């Protein structure tokens, strides 16, 4: 998806197993943006034949084949660099603590995490501030909007499993591409809150609802407001802001640590259920017909101080091993369907994903821009 042009068909979707989404984000008109797609079922690019002449080593190449020839040569080049710097990867987000440890142990590469709580925009700002230093970020994990807006800052690279990533979830040359995604959800304490069938059902005396942060600053919180804005599959920021204004007015809006219900990505609410609260005290539901979904994109800095290690990192994240680590943390891998068809998907982990039904929606970029303008103008006055 090399351009920002977008259509408006965000309502229709196919069956849901991982995530199936119909949404126009860039370069497509009424096409599906899929985490779970037919196009994801083709075989990944194979490694070059052993009798094929190896290319000159190029750590900044746009593919394994063109720059390294074999995975072993990429691994050797990355090991010689010996380091990788990541930004905006908190350990509790989609299993990154384990993912970083596994990568470091497997390849003997020291991973330095800078500004782990950075937002996507702050990741880009951090890279600009640290540009030219050995500590500058090599790789990014970004929302789609930030990835598209900053594509010129990224190096093109197509991972080995490129063909398993839906065409609509990657920039054509490889400047950014999906690694995982999820649905917005409601996590709730069933001892105190009846299972909410909709976001509006949260407006109930005795319920304390929380967002994961400030929607003016945090993408997850903004997405939570927009999930509550859906009506018949159509986003309306005013509807979402009004819902939280009613919660605030009724004394039903609070902090996550005091909440009986939290609106957040399903992988975050599922992690809450699995740790601390326990499954008996915390459940996760994705309201039917109010299903908001999103991808998170990977990108390599064009100025990466450790270009081979950066490419090895992306190969690892999109490998079966890396994708299953995301799945273990309740995120939905970009290559999920292809892995399931090849019997390389962790079936036990997949069975633990929150169930979703209905037609998923992903906001196209013009819709995001319009909604953010509304939320920015009205949130402080109406919700505070």
Task: Mark where each language-model region is.
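Sec-dependent bacterial lipoprotein signal peptides
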Residues: 2-38
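Bacterial lipoprotein signal-peptidase II cleavage site
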Residues: 41-51
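Conserved C-terminal helix/tail region of periplasmic/extracytoplasmic solute-binding proteins
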Residues: 55-59, 359-384
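Extracytoplasmic "Venus flytrap"
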Residues: 56-71, 79-98, 296
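Sec-exported extracytoplasmic/periplasmic mature domains
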Residues: 76-83, 101-109, 128-132, 145, ...
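Extracytoplasmic ligand-binding site segments that recognize negatively charged/polar headgroups
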Residues: 85-100, 112-128, 132-261, 272
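Periplasmic-binding protein-like
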Residues: 167-168, 181-185, 240-247, 277-307, ...
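Mature extracytoplasmic/periplasmic domains
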Residues: 292, 296, 301-363
């Amino acid at each position: 998806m090399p351009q920002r042009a977008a259509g408006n068909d965000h309502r229709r979707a196919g069956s849901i197993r991982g995530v199936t989404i119909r949404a126009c984000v860039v370069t497509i008109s009424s096409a599906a943006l899929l985490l779970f797609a037919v196009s994801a079922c083709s075989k990944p690019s194979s490694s070059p034949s052993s009798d094929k002449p190896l290319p000159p080593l190029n750590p900044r190449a746009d593919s394994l084949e063109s720059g390294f020839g074999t995975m072993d040569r990429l691994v050797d080049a990355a090991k010689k660099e010996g380091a990788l710097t990541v930004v905006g990867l908190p350990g509790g987000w989609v299993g990154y603590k384990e993912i970083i440890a596994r990568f470091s142990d497997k390849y003997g590469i020291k991973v330095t995490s800078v500004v782990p709580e950075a937002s996507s925009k702050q990741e880009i700002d951090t890279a600009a501030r640290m540009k030219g230093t050995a500590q500058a970020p090599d790789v990014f994990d970004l929302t789609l909007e930030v990835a598209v807006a900053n594509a010129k800052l990224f190096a093109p690279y197509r991972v080995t499993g490129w063909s398993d990533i839906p065409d609509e979830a990657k920039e054509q040359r490889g400047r950014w591409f999906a690694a995982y995604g999820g649905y917005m959800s409601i996590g709730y304490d069933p001892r105190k809150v009846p299972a909410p069938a909709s976001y509006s059902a949260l407006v109930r005396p005795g319920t304390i609802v929380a967002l994961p942060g400030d929607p003016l600053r945090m993408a997850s919180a903004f997405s939570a407001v927009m999930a509550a804005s859906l009506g018949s599959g159509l986003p309306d920021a005013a509807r979402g802001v009004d819902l939280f204004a009613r919660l605030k007015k009724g004394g039903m809006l609070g902090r996550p640590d005091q909440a009986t219900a939290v609106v957040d990505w399903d992988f975050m609410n599922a992690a809450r259920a699995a740790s601390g609260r326990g499954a008996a005290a915390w459940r996760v539901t994705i309201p039917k017909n109010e299903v908001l979904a999103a991808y998170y994109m990977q990108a390599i800095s064009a100025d990466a101080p450790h270009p081979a290690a950066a490419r090895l990192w992306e190969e690892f994240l999109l490998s079966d091993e890396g994708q299953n680590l995301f799945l273990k943390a309740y995120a939905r891998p970009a290559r999920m369907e292809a892995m399931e068809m090849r019997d390389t998907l962790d079936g036990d982990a997949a069975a633990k994903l929150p169930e979703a039904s209905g037609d998923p929606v992903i906001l196209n970029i013009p819709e995001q821009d319009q909604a953010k303008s509304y939320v920015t103008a009205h949130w402080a006055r109406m919700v505070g």
